[in-house]
UniProtKB/Swiss-Prot annotation:
EC number in record: 2.7.7.6
Signal peptide span: none
UniProt name for this protein: DNA-directed RNA polymerase subunit alpha
Family that this chain belongs to: Belongs to the RNA polymerase alpha chain family.
Gene: rpoA
Any single Gene Ontology cellular-component annotation: cytoplasm
UniProt keyword list: DNA-directed RNA polymerase, Nucleotidyltransferase, Transcription, Transferase
Catalytic reaction list: RNA(n) + a ribonucleoside 5'-triphosphate = RNA(n+1) + diphosphate
Species annotation: Xanthomonas oryzae pv. oryzae (strain PXO99A)
Length: 332
């Protein structure tokens, strides 16, 4: 790597050191002085608050009307059972919610492995203890699983129909984040004669539903998507003034960011110079599937979002791009 004093270094690809199944160190170097703390702090915040995951949000237990009900044959209080359910690590392969059940005949230990799942749901920590049955008692419960990010108290998810909700439906405070712990350190790095560089070391532990490398990659995608708007000032400033004069439906001149696609789908499209909705609808399904890293799941997402706006792939537009719209994704 040749380095000059008047250019900002671009770090090499991350180095991954796996410490356990759920813990790893990610090393990024070399970085300009100060960039280690800048990137480390930003990634740590996003990793802890914004990585999506799944959690149990509602529980119904036969014979239990509220959190303070006493259940004969159950060693723990109902409150302790609910706390233990919050630590069940769940992975869903598709969809945003599911309802599962658990049935256990005592005496014995009830673990996460006793939760009945289907092909779409996977319990990662099956040995996690939920409660203990001390007598020949049956425990039956229904669990609602939902997708989210960060921490959401039960009160924040209360719906307008709260007054008429089913008696015995217990709502849980939910921690959706699959990231359990993140710490970072900045060490000294050297390239050739430069000794004033940073090395960023991120130590990350997850609950097993996502590996550390994928979590860091997702956090980087989120940061990249948020920062991308700062390179789009001209686009947004002029975007409202051009459509009426062009004779083109204003919707087609909106940036693909307005479709609120996932970060991965949006980045794949931009990498192929697809910046406007008008660019996108002229592409066919076959063409999009040839896009690197854009699979059938992303294609389905794109088709559904377009359909909500009365649009579809494979449409033909005359005189596209209209005057004032540049090919590189900026309004001219």
């Amino acid at each position: 790597m040749t380095v000059t004093a008047n250019q900002v270094l671009r770090p090499r690809g991350p180095q991954i050191e796996r410490l356990t199944d759920n813990r790893a160190k990610v090393v990024i170097e070399p970085l300009e002085r100060g960039y280690g703390h800048t990137l480390g702090n930003a990634l740590r915040r996003v990793l802890l608050s914004s990585i999506p995951g799944f959690a149990i949000t509602e529980v119904e237990i036969d014979g239990v009307l509220h959190e303070y009900t006493t259940v004969e044959g159950l060693q723990e209080d109902v409150l302790d059972v609910l706390l233990n359910l919050k630590d069940v690590a769940i992975r869903m392969h598709s969809g945003d919610s599911a309802t599962l059940s658990l049935s256990k005949q005592g005496p014995g230990t009830v673990t996460a492995a006793d939760i009945r799942t289907d092909h779409n749901v996977e319990i990662i920590n099956g040995d996690h203890v939920i409660c203990h049955l001390t007598k020949d008692t049956a425990l039956n419960m229904r669990l609602k699983i939902e997708r989210g990010f960060g921490y959401q108290p039960a009160a924040a998810r209360r719906r307008p129909d709260e007054e008429t909700r089913t008696i015995g439906r217990l709502m849980l405070d939910a921690s959706f984040s699959p990231v359990r712990r993140v710490a970072y350190a900045v060490e000294a790095a050297r390239v050739e004669q430069r000794t004033d560089l940073d090395k960023l070391v991120i130590d990350i532990e997850t609950n097993g539903t996502i590996d550390a490398e994928e979590a860091v990659r997702t956090a980087a995608d989120i940061l990249s998507d948020q920062l991308s708007v700062f390179g789009d000032f001209t686009h947004r400033d002029r975007g409202a003034a051009k459509p009426a004069a062009s004779g083109v439906d204003p919707v087609l001149l909106r940036p693909i960011d307005d479709l609120e696609l996932t970060v991965r789908s949006a980045n794949c499209l931009k990498a192929e110079s697809i910046y406007y909705i008008g660019d996108l609808i002229q592409k066919t399904e076959v063409e999009l599937l040839k896009t690197p890293n854009l699979g059938k799941k992303s294609l389905t997402e794109i088709k559904e979002v377009l359909a909500q706006r009365g649009l579809a792939l494979g449409m033909k537009l005359e005189n596209w791009p209209p005057a004032g719209v540049a090919q590189h994704g900026m309004l001219g």
